[in-house]
């Protein structure tokens, strides 16, 4: 049996990391650094939900028309021809993500992607519990909602986007509530996940903690 350290550092080995956590917890930045460090393909699972949200908007489908959205989810094609960080798209994506039929349809795509990619880190909300329960390493990132709102606010400001901190915080709290209370795969860490609170940690400090965990993990 190949140990975790060998899988992580030997690029000839298959190696899968699941990276879960709430919105604006720092998953994206951390995931990209880990992907580069361990030669992994990085995939943000929220893209499929945002793509579906964008398709609903562009095709003028009301997200309350559940049957229409479910039908659309069966025909999803990724083109990434939209602003991934658009808050309106993100909020719609969060609304449709609570529908179990939609999650099932989109998860089929994600599961297939994990199974056919030798070295991957997939980021999302239920990767370690649903999409890749057999991942070699499961990480769950969390942080205080206020800290997360401030981070998102700074990110948007740096890109020249107009935003209001209180509104970002309100949306984060609302999204957390949806994610945790949905019946289909609620936001929870896997029982064997490495849980890291990033409230007082930089992305590099988190990566260092993960690296040390890999080096010292006894299979």
Swiss-Prot record:
Its EC number is 2.7.4.25. Keywords: ATP-binding, Cytoplasm, Kinase, Nucleotide-binding, Transferase. It comes from the Bacteria. Its main location: cytoplasm. One of its GO terms (biological process) is pyrimidine nucleotide metabolic process. Gene3D superfamilies: P-loop containing nucleotide triphosphate hydrolases (3.40.50.300). It is found in: Cytoplasm. It holds the Pfam family Cytidylate_kin. GO terms for molecular function: ATP binding; CMP kinase activity; dCMP kinase activity. The keyword Repressor does not apply. One of its GO terms (cellular component) is cytoplasm. CDD domains: CMPK. ATP binds at residues 21-29. It catalyses: CMP + ATP = CDP + ADP; dCMP + ATP = dCDP + ADP. Belongs to the cytidylate kinase family. Type 1 subfamily. This is Cytidylate kinase.
């Amino acid at each position: 049996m190949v140990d975790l350290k060998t899988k992580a550092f030997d690029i000839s080995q298959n190696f899968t990391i699941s990276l879960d956590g709430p919105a604006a917890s720092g998953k994206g930045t951390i995931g990209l650094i880990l992907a580069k460090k361990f030669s992994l393909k990085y995939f943000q699972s929220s893209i499929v939900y945002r793509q579906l949200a964008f398709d609903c908007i562009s095709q003028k489908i009301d997200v309350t028309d559940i049957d229409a959205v479910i039908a659309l989810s069966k025909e999803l094609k990724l083109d990434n021809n939209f602003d991934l960080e658009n808050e309106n798209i993100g909020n719609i994506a969060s609304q449709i993500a609570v529908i179990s039929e939609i999650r099932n349809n989109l998860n089929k795509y994600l599961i297939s992607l994990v199974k056919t990619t030798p070295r991957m880190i997939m980021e999302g909300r239920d990767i370690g519990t649903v999409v890749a329960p057999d991942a070699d390493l499961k990480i769950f990132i969390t942080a205080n909602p206020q800290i997360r709102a401030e981070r998102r606010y700074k990110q948007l400001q740096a890109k020249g986007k107009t935003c209001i901190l209180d509104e970002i915080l309100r949306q984060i709290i609302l999204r957390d509530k949806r994610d945790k209370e949905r019946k289909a795969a609620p936001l929870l860490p896997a029982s064997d996940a490495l849980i890291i609170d990033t409230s007082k940690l930089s992305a590099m400090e988190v990566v260092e903690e993960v690296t040390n965990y890999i080096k010292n993990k006894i299979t």
